[in-house]
């Protein structure tokens, strides 16, 4: 069951149970996906579950009758459902809830029906009729009504099937039989009610001698066996789809009548098979049913040949009723099996693969009865021929030609170009899908391989290459599944190799992935340094003020100036300015179908004033068929990783620029050195934090994971393995870089914001000092003009500059509270960093994320933050404990306090 089907079923179940609020569908979906186990049906387990439900039910007969009815229709997954229901009978609490829910729903339904119900008055009969007239009228009406109703239902069913198949095959409509085919019942070959073999009045059979009675009845039976009413034996009108019944003259001798009743089931079976053949020969029922009907028609012809031979014996006076009963024995068994199959196909409304499943299961059920099994094998082999033709085209050439929608693989109209444009497009998953109802039971285990085989070849065909499997052989049905299993395995291996070689060698998949790694994961630093030097000024602007063509030009220049110039795919790299920041993008991806996503769907994107640095990202042009692997989902993951690292790189550059500009502070007087030292220390702590985080992400997460990906790609045997390895690589990088945990990402984002605000503050202060220094320089130049000696000039320059800077620093301290500002930055940064370390510690122990433990040891390599956290916890515990004076004796040792994150 696909993920989308699970989502749909869980949501529908919650709606039926009227469950609102709570944990939400996602929790139950996750539980179902983690605890899925295949249910293996056995006769014992199915019978035990059935017996348990029957014992629990108030009406066990009705339940068993319904179970047998569904079983006769070959209903899929019936036994797993019965097993689940038997388990529910053991859970009293769940049963009570379901009963209460059913009662409430019934009351609501009754209230809805009651409001729209109107009374109907039945007029009294105008005159009276006798019982005999009433019986005759009932028979006439029943005959007309049943025939017309049955014909209307068949016509309606054909129309529904035709409309459904025309909708799926919009370019090719099914042909239609002319109306006279259905208007002339004599063409069907079944009984015509009310039409006898002669218009002569039949003699009362009770007046005839026993030998004459037997001869007349034999002649009647020969007619009845080919679908024609006799004088003394006639067919009754059908009541729906029930078996044909016959009316035998009651005046017939009892012994003869008993033998007649033994032979009549053959005629009833013939009638059922004939109707089935005529009905399933319509175009709407598909090629499998056509082939089955044709095989049955061949057997019916043999039956007619037998009847004609018996008629010849009868004309020679050599056929008695006893001989007829003897000769008809083999045909009785054959016609009974054919009628049983026809009835089961009708009840189950089987088409295509479901018909083959029924025939296959019936063949197995006749194990031990060689003649019956041989008959079923003949029918199954004939019916499977058109299905295997479609299968061969699919697994040998990647083509689906299924005009009647019978095949297990269904094609959907999707444009392959959208896989690069739309995040939610599922070309690889949804272009071709499995139709569970059309999987023959003998191909159930191979369904996924059959789907993948055709998909692989189809991708190569979409690229303009004609492929034909060199190991192609005709597939013929057999009870030994190994025969066609081996053939499907060979086709799968060939298709896997063809597509894998096509992507790896001709389309250079690995080279494209390396190119993406170079840009999105910052594999080579010189390109990034060049680009940031060129574009940083432009990226500082608000998004609305940025000119994308200018950024594209700067990107092109950076590519040509760096080692990226040797990359053959550098022209596929593009600029993308996202409409929201990284956290919002992450929540949109993680919170699909949740309250958070619904709330954000109504948010105005213009409310967030993003800078170019926050909105900037790369994009990559991927062409078909590489877009199967590097699709929009994968590119979105790459973009999130890039934006995360890009902003870290930007913060690092800002902190380094503060370090460069702070060299001027060495000239400060001792009066200002103390609080300048605090700012420098904080800057170094911030720089240490950012650089260690970057080192962890690039060298402890991405590089090892990338090497694992390259190793896995070399050993991959098919494209699904490649897709799985690539997706696993991205998911691992996102998880270990803290991008799948919104709580960690929010704390990390706050830390980055504190660093950026600190650098802005320091840069403003440095620019102010630089401006005052320039003013001091101008004053010194004025003094030089007055004629001071050269040595004195140099000493005066340094002294004057130091004096101006010290005075400015003291002024800033007094006016703007610079020291208090630095202390506030220090406090906020330390608080957020301690919060991050505490959360990382929790996740590393609870979720066994050992990589996060590496982050902790890297950020707190000397125990500095652990000591601060312990000291903070001790202070809080002392404030919470009341102070009790101690009169004498040494002070008691302080208790050890557990460190907790606040």
UniProtKB/Swiss-Prot annotation:
UniProt KW keywords: Cytoplasm, Cytoskeleton, Disease variant, Epilepsy, Intellectual disability, Lissencephaly, Microtubule, Phosphoprotein
Keyword Flavoprotein applies: no
Phosphotyrosine PTM sites in chain numbering: 83
Result after altering residue 615 to P: In CDCBM15; uncertain significance
Keyword Phosphoprotein part of the UniProt annotation: yes
Pfam family, one: GCP_N_terminal
Membrane spanning residue stretches: none
Protein's GO biological process: brain development; cytoplasmic microtubule organization; meiotic cell cycle; microtubule nucleation; mitotic cell cycle; neuron migration; protein-containing complex assembly; spindle assembly
Ranges for region Disordered: 874-902
MF annotations from Gene Ontology: gamma-tubulin binding
Domain of life, per lineage: Eukaryota
Compartments, record wording: Cytoplasm, Cytoskeleton, Microtubule organizing center, Centrosome
Recorded consequence of changing residue 333 to C: In CDCBM15; uncertain significance
Tissue expression profile of the protein: Ubiquitously expressed.
Main location: cytoplasm
GO cellular component: centrosome; ciliary basal body; cytoplasmic microtubule; cytosol; gamma-tubulin complex; membrane; microtubule organizing center; nucleoplasm
Protein role: Component of the gamma-tubulin ring complex (gTuRC) which mediates microtubule nucleation. The gTuRC regulates the minus-end nucleation of alpha-beta tubulin heterodimers that grow into microtubule protafilaments, a critical step in centrosome duplication and spindle formation. Plays a role in neuronal migration.
Similarity section: Belongs to the TUBGCP family.
Oligomer status and interactors: Component of the gamma-tubulin ring complex (gTuRC) consisting of TUBGCP2, TUBGCP3, TUBGCP4, TUBGCP5 and TUBGCP6 and gamma-tubulin TUBG1 or TUBG2. TUBGCP2, TUBGCP3, TUBGCP4, TUBGCP5 and TUBGCP6 assemble in a 5:5:2:1:1 stoichiometry; each is associated with a gamma-tubulin, thereby arranging 14 gamma-tubulins in a helical manner. Gamma-tubulin at the first position is blocked by TUBGCP3 at the last position, allowing 13 protafilaments to grow into a microtubule.
Disease per UniProt entry: Cortical dysplasia, complex, with other brain malformations 15: An autosomal recessive disorder characterized by global developmental delay, variably impaired intellectual development, speech delay, facial dysmorphism, microcephaly, and varying degrees of cortical malformations including pachygyria, thin corpus callosum and subcortical band heterotopia. Most patients have generalized seizures.
PANTHER family in the record: GAMMA TUBULIN COMPLEX PROTEIN, GAMMA-TUBULIN COMPLEX COMPONENT 2
Record's protein name: Gamma-tubulin complex component 2
Organism: Homo sapiens (Human)
Upper classification of the organism: Eukaryota, Metazoa, Chordata, Craniata, Vertebrata
């Amino acid at each position: 069951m696909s993920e989308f089907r699970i989502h749909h079923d869980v949501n529908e179940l919650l709606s039926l149970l009227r469950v609102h609020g709570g944990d939400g569908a996602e929790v139950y979906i996750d539980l179902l996906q983690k605890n899925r186990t295949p249910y293996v049906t056995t006769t014992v387990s199915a019978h035990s579950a059935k017996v348990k439900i029957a014992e629990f039910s108030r009406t066990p007969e009705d339940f068993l009758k319904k179970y047998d009815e569904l079983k006769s229709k070959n209903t899929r997954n019936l036994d797993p459902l019965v097993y689940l229901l038997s388990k529910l009978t053991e859970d009293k609490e769940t049963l009570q809830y379901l009963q209460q829910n059913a009662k409430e729903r019934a009351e609501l339904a009754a209230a809805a029906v009651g409001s729209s119900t109107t009374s109907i008055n039945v007029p009294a009969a105008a005159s009276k009729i006798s019982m005999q007239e009433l019986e005759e009228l009932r028979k006439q009406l029943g005959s007309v009504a049943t025939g017309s109703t049955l014909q209307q239902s068949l016509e309606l069913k054909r129309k529904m099937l035709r409309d459904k198949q025309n909708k799926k095959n919009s370019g090719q409509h099914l042909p239609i039989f002319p109306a006279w085919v259905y208007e002339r019942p004599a063409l069907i070959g079944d009984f015509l009610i009310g039409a006898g073999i002669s218009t002569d009045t039949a003699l009362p059979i009770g007046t005839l001698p026993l030998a004459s009675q037997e001869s007349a009845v034999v002649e009647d039976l020969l007619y009845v066996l080919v679908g024609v009413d006799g004088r003394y034996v006639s067919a009754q009108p059908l009541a729906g789809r029930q078996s044909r019944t016959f009316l035998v003259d009651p005046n017939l001798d009892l012994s003869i009548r008993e033998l007649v009743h033994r032979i009549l089931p053959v005629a009833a079976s013939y009638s059922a098979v004939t109707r089935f053949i005529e009905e399933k020969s319509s175009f709407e029922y598909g090629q499998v049913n056509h082939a089955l009907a044709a095989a049955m028609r061949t057997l019916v012809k043999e039956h007619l040949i037998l009847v004609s031979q018996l008629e010849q014996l009868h004309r020679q006076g050599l056929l008695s009723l006893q001989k007829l009963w003897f000769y008809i024995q083999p045909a009785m068994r054959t016609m009974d099996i054919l009628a049983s199959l026809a009835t089961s196909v009708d009840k189950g409304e089987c088409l295509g693969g479901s018909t083959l499943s029924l025939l296959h299961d019936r063949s197995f059920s006749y194990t031990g009865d060689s003649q019956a099994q041989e008959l079923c094998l003949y029918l199954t082999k004939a019916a499977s021929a058109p299905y295997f033709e479609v299968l061969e085209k699919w697994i040998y050439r990647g083509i689906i030609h299924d005009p009647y929608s019978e095949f297990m693989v269904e094609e959907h109209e999707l444009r392959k170009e959208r896989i690069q444009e739309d995040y939610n497009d599922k070309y690889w998953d949804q272009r071709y899908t499995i139709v569970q109802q059309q999987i023959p039971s003998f191909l159930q285990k191979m369904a996924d391989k059959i789907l993948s085989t055709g998909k692989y070849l189809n991708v190569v065909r979409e690229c303009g290459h004609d492929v034909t499997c060199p190991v192609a052989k005709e597939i013929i049905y057999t009870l030994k599944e190994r025969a066609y299993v081996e053939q499907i395995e060979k086709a799968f291996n060939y298709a896997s190799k063809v597509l894998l070689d096509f992507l790896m060698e001709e389309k250079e998949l690995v080279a494209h992935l390396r190119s993406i790694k170079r840009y999105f994961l910052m594999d080579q630093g010189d390109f990034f340094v060049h680009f940031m030097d060129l574009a940083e000024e432009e990226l500082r602007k608000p998004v609305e003020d940025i000119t994308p063509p200018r950024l594209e030009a700067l990107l092109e220049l950076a590519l040509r100036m760096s080692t990226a110039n040797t990359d053959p795919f550098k022209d596929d790299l593009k600029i993308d300015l996202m409409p929201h920041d990284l956290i919002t993008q992450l929540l949109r991806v993680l919170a699909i179908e949740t309250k958070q996503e619904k709330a954000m769907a109504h948010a105005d994107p213009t409310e967030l004033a993003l800078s170019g640095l926050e909105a900037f990202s790369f994009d990559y042009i991927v062409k078909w068929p590489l877009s199967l692997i590097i699709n929009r989902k994968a590119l979105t993951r790459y973009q999130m990783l890039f934006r995360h690292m890009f902003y870290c790189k930007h913060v690092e550059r800002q902190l380094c620029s503060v370090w460069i500009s702070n060299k001027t502070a060495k000239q400060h007087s001792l009066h200002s050195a103390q609080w300048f030292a605090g700012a420098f220390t904080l800057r170094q702590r911030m720089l240490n934090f950012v650089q260690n985080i970057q080192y962890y992400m690039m060298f402890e997460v991405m590089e090892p994971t990338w090497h694992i990906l390259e190793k896995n790609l070399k050993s991959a045997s098919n494209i699904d393995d490649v897709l799985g390895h690539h997706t696993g690589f991205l998911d691992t990088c996102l998880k270990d870089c803290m991008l799948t945990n919104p709580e960690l990402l929010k704390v990390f984002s706050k830390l980055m914001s504190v660093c950026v605000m600190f650098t802005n503050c320091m840069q403003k202060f440095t620019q102010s000092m630089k401006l005052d220094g320039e003013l001091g320089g101008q004053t010194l130049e004025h003094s030089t003009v007055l004629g001071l000696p050269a040595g004195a000039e140099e000493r005066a320059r340094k002294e004057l500059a130091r004096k101006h800077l010290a005075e400015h620093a003291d002024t800033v301290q007094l006016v703007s509270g610079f020291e208090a500002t630095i202390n506030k930055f220090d406090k906020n940064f330390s608080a957020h960093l301690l919060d991050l370390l505490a959360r990382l510690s929790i996740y590393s122990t609870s979720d066994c994320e050992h990589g996060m433990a590496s982050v902790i040891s890297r950020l707190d390599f000397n125990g500095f933050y652990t000591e601060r956290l312990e000291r903070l916890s001790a202070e809080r515990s002392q404030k919470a404990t009341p102070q009790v004076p101690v009169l004498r004796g040494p002070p008691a040792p302080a208790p050890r306090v557990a460190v907790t994150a606040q």
